[in-house]
């Protein structure tokens, strides 16, 4: 299976870069998945969790909003704010707290924020 290149960038710099099997993005019309060979598109992203599947594990990045450019071979995410939540990390609890704060500040839609926060807490 061909791998997809992905980068997640915020104004302060790069949050994540790598080669992945798939990525699920929080689009404004709902979540959608991207695999290698996807049609080209540019889309607006809402507050949510970017789910990244690598060869060995799943990784998660909380974003407050942004844009994604998808091509056949890569996904470039430009976000206003992002927190990488590493599964095997000493600062995991701190990352989850920062992700919750980022998402709570991103939207006044309490129902949508609650749904995303529940997803983060289950990681």
From Swiss-Prot:
SUPFAM superfamilies: Epsilon subunit of F1F0-ATP synthase N-terminal domain (SSF51344). Keywords: ATP synthesis, Cell inner membrane, Cell membrane, CF(1), Hydrogen ion transport, Ion transport, Membrane, Transport. CDD domains: F1-ATPase_delta. It is found in: Cell inner membrane. One of its GO terms (molecular function) is proton-transporting ATP synthase activity, rotational mechanism. InterPro entries: ATP_synth_F1_dsu/esu (IPR001469), ATP_synth_F1_dsu/esu_N (IPR020546), ATPsynth_dsu/esu_N (IPR036771). One of its GO terms (cellular component) is proton-transporting ATP synthase complex. Pfam families: ATP-synt_DE_N. Produces ATP from ADP in the presence of a proton gradient across the membrane. F-type ATPases have 2 components, CF(1) - the catalytic core - and CF(0) - the membrane proton channel. CF(1) has five subunits: alpha(3), beta(3), gamma(1), delta(1), epsilon(1). CF(0) has three main subunits: a, b and c. This is ATP synthase epsilon chain. It comes from Helicobacter pylori (strain HPAG1).
């Amino acid at each position: 299976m061909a791998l997809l290149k992905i980068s997640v960038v915020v104004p302060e710099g790069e949050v994540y870069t790598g080669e992945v099997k798939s990525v699920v993005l929080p689009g404004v019309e709902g979540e959608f998945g991207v695999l290698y060979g996807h049609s080209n598109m540019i889309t607006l992203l809402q507050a949510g969790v970017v789910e990244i599947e690598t060869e060995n594990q799943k990784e998660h990045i909380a974003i407050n909003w942004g844009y994604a450019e998808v091509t056949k071979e890569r996904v470039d995410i430009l976000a206003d704010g992002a927190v990488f939540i590493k599964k095997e990390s000493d600062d995991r609890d701190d990352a989850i707290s920062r992700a919750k704060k980022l998402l709570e500040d991103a939207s006044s839609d309490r129902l949508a924020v609650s749904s995303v926060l529940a997803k983060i807490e289950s990681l």
